[in-house]
Amino acid sequence: MGRSVYVASPEGLTGKSAVALGLLDALTREVGSVGVYRPLTTAGPGSDDIDLIVDLLVNQPGISQSYDEAIGVTYEAARQDADEALHVIVERFGQLTDRFEVILVVGSDYTDVATGTELSFNAKIAANLGSPVVLVVHGRERNPEQIRAAADSAIAELRVNHAQTVAVIANRVDHDSAEAIRAALADLPGDVVTAAIPENPLLSAPTFRALVEAADGELVLGSQTWMDREAMGVIVAAMSLPHVLDRLVPDVAVIAASDRTDLLPGLMLAHQSGTFPALAGILLTGGYDMPETIRRLSEGVQQHLPIALTDLGTFTTAERVVRVRGPITKDSSRKIETAHREFAERVDQAALLRAIDVSGSEVR
């Protein structure tokens, strides 16, 4: 089979999509043609759902491949008959090998049904595809010893299933611990390429639109385009304006009761002033219509800042929006650029590409 590399993780929320995006960028700079393959997905060909990672990767510059061509089988198919699913996965992968010099394979997400066998199944897939594995381990709120233990355990599981690990990337690590984590991974056996990438809040930040949708709200003033800007935090404006202004940070979403119309002019002026941080948007709760006088003032003062309204109460709204995660999508230009930069700065790409080129699986 042609050259390939398998990006896998032993758990969810590792930020694997950002690593895959950075690796894809490195590969497309190095070789003439790169394909994308997702062996397991919740959104197979013909589904109404979309696998966001596949949609992201096949829409990157230099990728000439349709969404359906990048899909293997669904989780449901794998649950019903794992052996048949593996056969189909290998068969569909084989249809790509003659078209591309290298194929980037992205493992499962652990967001469907995370079980103790999921990494094992990913390992079997990697082994049968002949793909060396780039292992992405979760570094958030973990110390160097915990990350090393997670890497050792996952590498052992991969080895038992005949998959070879050529790189370990600890992702979303604490900035202050990055050097210690790199040192903890440096002596992994087998000449494994290692790296530690610090957490970047932008990469998991939801858009203001996603927050509004989570609260069943709708835009009442401002720009639809600005609804797609990332919200880097949320504050509840349950205090007077001077105290709210003290708590503003760049690109924050402000939740305020819709009958607190005294706050709106001050927040809009702060957003426009240049002396306070720009906001992601304002989400008004309680369902009260904006008074006509405030609406006229708003239309005169600001042009872009989105202001949305929900019928939900402030507590329920806040409870919903703080749970919203923001995946990297094909339209997330800031996130894509950031993922490329973080990967390029933190990973020895030349060493990683050499490891991918010379490595393979024990199973053919």
Where are these regions (language model features)?
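P-loop NTP-binding module
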Residues: 4-11, 26, 59-61, 85-107, ...
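N-terminal phosphate/diphosphate-binding loop that engages ATP/GTP or pyrophosphate donors
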Residues: 2-99, 112-115
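Non-catalytic interface/targeting segments
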Residues: 200-259, 327-363
